[in-house]
Amino acid sequence: MTTRKCNKFRKTSESEISLSLNLDGEGKSNIDTGIGFLNHMLNLMTKHGFLDLDIKAIGDLEVDAHHTVEDIGIVLGKALKEALGNKEKIKRYGTCFLPMDESLAFVSIDISGRAFLVYNCEFTVDKVGDMDTELVEEFLRAFAFNSEITLHTKILYGKNNHHMIEAIFKALGRAIKEAVLIDEKIKGVMSTKGII
């Protein structure tokens, strides 16, 4: 099987990000974004997705975390797209309902080549740890649009905002794991068009 790995580096006036992704990993991560809560969420996503992910990010956190979070989503999305190559034999779709104590999250993805985000998540606080809760949507949008996937996410219910966000990231990891699985029964790509 072709190695499905990608290394990316992106530098702007707002952030500098180096990233290494292995789709066929063991759930190992080495993540330093400068944002403790985001580190925690990406570690969880990596573990549940059986990805190997290294990220070193330096951003303008003296402004706020927006640029750094969004730019990590951009780089991770581009890395996923590149690591998938021609997308032959991948299952394409991945869906996960994931409970975290009192919270339940739903994530479904389609590695379609069509970038789209449906985001139905509401939080009751502005910040969890050192990250604004509104940045969850910014991260997911940047990730979906740069990986060219369709991504639906919804919080069905919950009270603890940490638990709700944690459920999203764990579910995202599991949905990615399912969608990128190789199925030898698939001839070419999982589309009657012959391309995704």
Curated annotation (Swiss-Prot):
EC number in record: 4.2.1.19
Record GO cellular component, one term: cytoplasm
Keyword Amino-acid biosynthesis attributed: yes
Domain of life where this protein originates: Bacteria
Subcellular location: Cytoplasm
Gene3D superfamilies to which the protein is assigned, alphabetical: Imidazole glycerol phosphate dehydratase, domain 1 (3.30.230.40)
Catalysed reaction equations from the record: D-erythro-1-(imidazol-4-yl)glycerol 3-phosphate = 3-(imidazol-4-yl)-2-oxopropyl phosphate + H2O
Example of a GO MF term: imidazoleglycerol-phosphate dehydratase activity
Keywords of the record: Amino-acid biosynthesis, Cytoplasm, Histidine biosynthesis, Lyase
Pathway: Amino-acid biosynthesis; L-histidine biosynthesis; L-histidine from 5-phospho-alpha-D-ribose 1-diphosphate: step 6/9
GO biological process: L-histidine biosynthetic process
NCBIfam families for this protein: PRK00951.1-2 (NF002107), PRK00951.2-1 (NF002111), PRK00951.2-4 (NF002114)
Family statement drawn from the similarity comment of this UniProt entry: Belongs to the imidazoleglycerol-phosphate dehydratase family.
Name this polypeptide is given: Imidazoleglycerol-phosphate dehydratase
Organism: Clostridium novyi (strain NT)
